[in-house]
Amino acid sequence: MRQVILLITNRSDISVLDKIHSQMSLSNESNDFFVLYNGTADSLPKTYANIKERFFCFSNDILYTMGYFPLGDSLAPGNCHFPVLKFYLTHPDYDYYCILEDDVTFSGKWDTLFSYYKNDVTVLLSSHIRTYSDYPEWPWWVTLESKEEDFEEKDVICAFNPIYRLSNRALKCIHESLSNGWRGHAEVVLSTILRHNGLTLKDIGGNGRFVPKGEENL
């Protein structure tokens, strides 16, 4: 099993640098690491000069060059899956892609968390996974659209994604669906596409319906 950790950022402060070095220290034959950096390679801050080989740089142009349908003209809110898909398309040989936002903190050891799910074949690991009926007041449901598919309300799923993991199979499915006209906020379109295609989702915390028995409130 080969996994890559992807940290999404446009920052260069000490907090982010510490996170980068922390993840780099875990890199080995099974676990790789890259920074998805919102900026050009030429504009990388000097802070990153010695580790620039770990950077996958992108601009907001990816919103219009990948054949998908974005929400607005910026990554946030709702388009943060674009650089993840871009990385997948240029690095398609990993089994799993674990994505971290740059403000995520974890009080435990990252390698313990990653090792716990090492043999888990679920295509999406995320948190606070809910159906429309669980959380009808969530404002981003209305962004979900598909030109070719119908979906029932019970199959519309949102997931909170400051940290989440997608399998290679999941990303292939998502890429094909987005290319065929699906669109929406990242936290609803990714999970709904996977659910619509009969793939598995797992909530990695709490006690909701997508948390497996015995793994509540881990």
Task: Show which residues each predicted segment covers.
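Active-site-proximal specificity loops/subdomain of glycosyltransferases
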Residues: G39-D93
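Short beta-strand-to-loop acidic/aromatic patch adjacent to the donor-nucleotide binding site
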Residues: Y94-D103
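N-proximal low-complexity "stem/linker" segments adjacent to membrane-targeting elements
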Residues: M1-S15
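Short, well-formed alpha-helical segments that are part of the catalytic scaffolds
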Residues: D13-L26
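Short beta-strand/turn micro-motifs composed of small residues
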Residues: L7-T9, V35-G39
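C-terminal catalytic/acceptor-binding lobe
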Residues: S177-L218
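Short loop->beta transition adjacent to catalytic acidic/histidine clusters or analogous donor-positioning motifs
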Residues: R2-Q3, L26-F34
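Conserved catalytic core of nucleotide-sugar-dependent glycosyltransferases
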Residues: F106-T192
